[in-house]
């Protein structure tokens, strides 16, 4: 019975975001007439794809840097996995995120545990630290966008999100989390003890950043990762005549809005181009052009993950034949 429940849960985790993505693809294109769809296709085909490949290259560099940055938090706990394993695990993680959202973080820790014998809980803790740092940087970018484009962004978010529902959901989740912590603290069951042991290792991984020996290298990699993230998005705007003259803050606004789309579906399928088109419409870019550009950006990121993630998936067992 438990096996069936787990199978159903995993199936829903995989299928529901995919179905939502396919629905958003249909929704995005259903609003256009035949002539507008032909225009989207024309703009898509006329784009300068040299910028797409430049974007792919920048995405590759950002993920390599993420893998290399990971070594510093692990080293602070006296674990020294092979650098190529760290980089390849990052690419495999992004590949798996296309199937089940957020599964990539777990897979990274599992791969390093398998090939370099780094305890899962500790390596997973370092990944959580990375994500916390990423969230801080994203919040900084959001603050910059709100300073320059507050009315526009607020109007956009109000149009697509019901904040009262979001607040209720967050409150319910918060109460459930508090109840879980209370149970975890008071329970003497074996499963609670195992969870506490796991969380203890995760906690050590999270606080590994406090003991970094190469802090400036870590900071440099972090800045490089985010500069590449933005540039891999920005350069694609030069692939079309109608978008190449948008200002830096306008592109940053689209970058911020686009980051929301990744949450809803596998890799932003359907949602990402839709969000990009809607926000660019506020800057006077025709929705047909914005839709075409959104798909070019999404395809650049998708190609990068499929290409290098698939290659990494094949290389990891080959390069670690004696480490299984």
Task: Map each language-model feature to its residues.
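Predominantly cytoplasmic-facing regulatory/coupling regions of multi-pass membrane proteins
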Residues: 1-90, 148, 152-259, 285, ...
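Juxtamembrane transmembrane-helix termini in multi-pass membrane transport proteins
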Residues: 74, 113-114, 123-124
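Membrane-interface alpha-helices at helix entry/exit sites of multi-pass transporters
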Residues: 83-88, 103-106, 118-132, 286-296
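Hydrophobic, aromatic-rich membrane-embedded alpha-helical segments
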Residues: 87-114
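Re-entrant/interfacial helical elements at transmembrane boundaries that shape
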Residues: 106-114, 266-282
